[in-house]
Amino acid sequence: LVGSDARPGDTFSRSDVMVLVHIPEDKSKVYLIHFPRDLWVSIPGHGQAKLNASYAFGGAPLLVQSMQNLIGVRIDHVVKTDFNGFEAMTDAVGGVTVYAEEASGATGNGGIDIKQGWNTLNGKQALSFVRERYQLSEGDISRGKRQMAFVKALLMKAISPEVITNPVKIAQFTDAATKNLIVDETMTTDYMRSEAFALRNVRGGDVVFITAPFTGFGWSSDGQSIDVVDQPGMQALGDAIRQDRLGDYKRTSVIP
């Protein structure tokens, strides 16, 4: 799942949201793996750079290639959206209720007051929620946790009885998704409906957050602030995905 920071008039953009979604074979859970944008990685054809630069250099194909090289796992599908997509899909389901680990004030990038705990947000407010990072304790890392919390909230609302039993809301959400999501050619409408139906028994506690492993913060040779990749940790993450045992990985991981 790629969220681009493109705004009107932009020719190139970096990806501010990079979440790898893993659904186990038994469809019992949904794992959301956040890849921090400042991970210092090798980008094919471009040398060392921040992970989100791969999207600016070569779009989704190069981002996928960079991530596959990082964890050693093939990525099956790509879904892209932008800020307008976040807003439109949130409004289509009537807003979302999301948990914030930290409060943030209206003076920050968000422009709204977010309290620590549960917040009910409309589309514009949700967009502010996922963009804020300057007031958060770990900057982009904390923002990534907010983004995963939002994705979870939107997913749970979209498959809730309030939406799936309401023909009007279903139509509104489908229309918003169709207009604001770009998917790879293998993700047909029938495929997406089938996957959504297969996840009908998933509840909030079944949506699990994981942050891709890094050893800490540092500086690149050209003076950029970076997240230092935990190479053994990335290999362990890739093995867990490939072997469909992310539950075991999560229980032993030192990064929440």
Regions found by a protein language model. Name each.
Residues 1-256:
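Non-catalytic, solvent-exposed segments at the cell envelope interface
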